[in-house]
Amino acid sequence: MARKCFFTGKGPMVGNNVSHANNKTKKRSLPNLRSIRLKLEDGTSVRVKVAASTLRTIKKYS
Protein backbone atom coordinates (compact mmCIF):
# COMPACT_ATOMS: atom_id res chain seq x y z
CA MET A 1 0.00 0.00 0.00
CA ALA A 2 2.87 2.33 -0.75
CA ARG A 3 2.33 5.94 -1.82
CA LYS A 4 -1.42 5.80 -1.26
CA CYS A 5 -3.59 7.58 1.29
CA PHE A 6 -5.18 5.14 3.76
CA PHE A 7 -8.52 6.97 3.91
CA THR A 8 -9.05 8.64 0.54
CA GLY A 9 -7.02 6.33 -1.71
CA LYS A 10 -5.16 9.24 -3.29
CA GLY A 11 -2.20 7.91 -5.21
CA PRO A 12 0.36 8.94 -7.82
CA MET A 13 -0.87 10.76 -10.92
CA VAL A 14 0.71 10.81 -14.38
CA GLY A 15 1.04 13.93 -16.51
CA ASN A 16 3.33 15.56 -19.03
CA ASN A 17 6.21 18.00 -18.82
CA VAL A 18 5.74 20.28 -21.82
CA SER A 19 8.73 22.22 -23.12
CA HIS A 20 8.69 25.47 -25.06
CA ALA A 21 9.11 23.42 -28.26
CA ASN A 22 6.02 21.41 -27.22
CA ASN A 23 8.02 18.24 -26.56
CA LYS A 24 6.22 16.08 -24.02
CA THR A 25 7.83 13.77 -21.47
CA LYS A 26 6.00 11.81 -18.81
CA LYS A 27 6.17 12.88 -15.18
CA ARG A 28 4.71 11.44 -12.01
CA SER A 29 3.28 13.63 -9.27
CA LEU A 30 3.14 11.93 -5.88
CA PRO A 31 0.64 12.75 -3.12
CA ASN A 32 1.89 14.66 -0.08
CA LEU A 33 1.83 11.70 2.33
CA ARG A 34 2.45 11.88 6.07
CA SER A 35 2.88 8.93 8.41
CA ILE A 36 0.68 9.33 11.48
CA ARG A 37 -0.26 7.22 14.46
CA LEU A 38 -3.98 6.84 15.17
CA LYS A 39 -5.28 5.69 18.54
CA LEU A 40 -8.09 3.18 18.32
CA GLU A 41 -10.98 2.84 20.76
CA ASP A 42 -9.43 -0.21 22.45
CA GLY A 43 -6.29 1.78 23.31
CA THR A 44 -3.97 0.39 20.66
CA SER A 45 -2.37 2.58 18.05
CA VAL A 46 -1.95 2.04 14.31
CA ARG A 47 0.55 3.75 12.01
CA VAL A 48 -0.97 4.78 8.66
CA LYS A 49 0.01 6.97 5.72
CA VAL A 50 -2.42 9.80 4.98
CA ALA A 51 -2.36 12.71 2.56
CA ALA A 52 -1.74 16.14 4.07
CA SER A 53 -5.19 17.30 2.95
CA THR A 54 -6.74 14.32 4.77
CA LEU A 55 -4.68 15.09 7.86
CA ARG A 56 -6.15 18.61 7.94
CA THR A 57 -9.66 17.13 7.83
CA ILE A 58 -8.84 14.63 10.60
CA LYS A 59 -7.51 17.42 12.83
CA LYS A 60 -10.55 19.57 12.04
CA TYR A 61 -13.05 16.99 13.31
CA SER A 62 -11.11 15.48 16.22
Swiss-Prot record:
GO cellular component, one term: ribosome
Cited InterPro entries: Bacterial_rp_bL28, Ribosomal_bL28, Ribosomal_bL28/bL31-like_sf, Ribosomal_bL28_bact-type, Ribosomal_bL28_sf
Sample GO molecular function, one term: structural constituent of ribosome
Keyword Nucleotidyltransferase: no
SUPFAM superfamilies xrefs: L28p-like (SSF143800)
This protein's record includes keyword Ribonucleoprotein: yes
Domain of life of the organism encoding this protein: Bacteria
Gene3D superfamilies: Ribosomal protein L28/L24
GO biological process, one term: translation
Keywords tagged on the record: Ribonucleoprotein, Ribosomal protein
Record-stated family: Belongs to the bacterial ribosomal protein bL28 family.
Name of the featured protein: Large ribosomal subunit protein bL28
Encoding gene (name): rpmB
